[in-house]
């Protein structure tokens, strides 16, 4: 299949995918277009520009938009080089085309970072590709037809290499700008949370410096995973804003806790003393309930005093140690040893004791 037929097929498939909103399959088609040599005749006689522009306009993926925009910028630079100076040698044409392409991509990056008016630039880019005069249709054969297929492939490879470097540079620049803004916002959130309960305005600079130090330590811990970094920031802010965790601010002011220690603290470490005691009681109760049998039929007695409610209304039985789920510090070598097991009928308290004989 010739390059023209491949371009027509790719353009038609891209338009179908955009119409059906199957955006996950468009990336492969754009990659194939990058590997195919596209001449000025192809830009004139096919709808590839319109198809790529539809991706740029309708696709929600930022990666696909950048790839489509780089393709359009490359084609515009190629069209300008062949349209304005068609009689130059292949080497000069290759150099000028790369310069035009680099200037176009650099202009796109500067416009994205400063004004954000990429829509008008994209419209101009597509119009420059599609606005071809009738007499230009007869010139490409004289301008490019004298070049060998090897020279054409070298030009195409030069475009791809230059385009990849410019796109990588653009992506890294945009990512760095976004990361700086995210980190600044996180410092602001930490400062607001730290100073939420502060009434003394003289301590404002203390909280500002502390917020910066905390953010730097958190970023150092999770610099390779931005999701974990954001999750840690949200956790720290929520715990600092919790009125029950006022001990965190007090520890900062007293110097008992540093910014690095706070950045490395887990959710359990940041909890208040009341919550820690509640968790410990729940854990102890759960372990005790898990160790004891679920239902035991025993003998009622009023000779045993409940250790919780101090009432004499209990039910007692004897069971084998091997039937209980006991921790290692309670177990011994004899699973058949009998244990006295007591249930309070008033409050439901349950407990057991080894070698205990009830009167």
UniProtKB/Swiss-Prot annotation:
Q: What is this protein called?
A: Transcription elongation factor A N-terminal and central domain-containing protein
Q: Where is the composition biased (Polar residues)?
A: 104-118
Q: What residue stretches are annotated with the TFIIS N-terminal domain?
A: 1-82
UniProt domain TFIIS central: residue ranges: 182-298
- Which PROSITE patterns does the entry link to? TFIIS_CENTRAL, TFIIS_N
The biological process GO terms on file are: DNA-templated transcription
- Taxonomically, the superkingdom here is Eukaryota
Q: Which segments carry the region annotation Disordered? A: 84-118
């Amino acid at each position: 299949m010739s390059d023209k037929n491949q371009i027509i097929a790719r353009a038609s498939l891209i338009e179908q995918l955009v119409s059906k909103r199957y955006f996950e399959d468009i990336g492969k088609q754009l990659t194939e277009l990058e590997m195919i040599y596209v001449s000025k005749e192809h830009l004139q006689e096919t709808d590839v520009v319109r198809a790529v522009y539809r991706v740029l306009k309708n696709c929600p993926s930022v990666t696909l938009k950048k790839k489509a925009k780089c393709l359009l910028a490359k084609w515009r630079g190629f069209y300008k080089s062949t349209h304005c100076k068609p009689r130059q040698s292949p080497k000069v044409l290759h150099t000028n085309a790369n310069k035009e392409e680099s200037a176009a991509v650099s202009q796109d990056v500067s416009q994205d970072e400063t004004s954000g008016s990429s829509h008008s630039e994209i419209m101009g880019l597509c119009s420059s590709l599609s606005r071809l005069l009738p007499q230009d249709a007869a010139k490409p054969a004289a301008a490019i037809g004298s070049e060998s297929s090897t020279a054409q492939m070298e030009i195409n490879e030069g475009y791809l290499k230059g385009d990849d470097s410019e796109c990588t540079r653009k992506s890294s620049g945009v990512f760095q700008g976004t990361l700086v803004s995210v980190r600044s916002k996180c410092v602001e959130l930490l400062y607001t949370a730290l100073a939420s309960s502060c009434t003394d305005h003289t301590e404002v600079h203390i909280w500002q410096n502390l917020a910066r130090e905390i953010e730097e330590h958190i970023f150092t811990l999770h610099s390779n995973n931005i999701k974990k970094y954001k999750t840690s920031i949200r956790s720290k802010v929520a715990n600092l804003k919790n009125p029950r965790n006022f001990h965190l601010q007090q520890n900062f002011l007293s110097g008992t806790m540093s910014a690095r220690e706070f950045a490395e603290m887990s959710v359990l470490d940041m909890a208040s003393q009341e919550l820690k005691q509640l968790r410990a009681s729940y854990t102890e109760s759960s372990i005790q309930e898990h160790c004891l049998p679920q239902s035991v039929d025993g003998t009622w007695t009023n000779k045993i005093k409940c250790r919780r409610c101090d009432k004499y209304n209990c039910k007692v039985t004897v069971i084998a140690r091997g039937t209980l789920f006991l921790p290692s510090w309670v177990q011994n070598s004899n699973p058949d040893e009998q244990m006295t097991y007591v249930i309070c009928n008033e409050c439901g308290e349950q407990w057991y004791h080894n070698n205990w004989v009830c009167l």
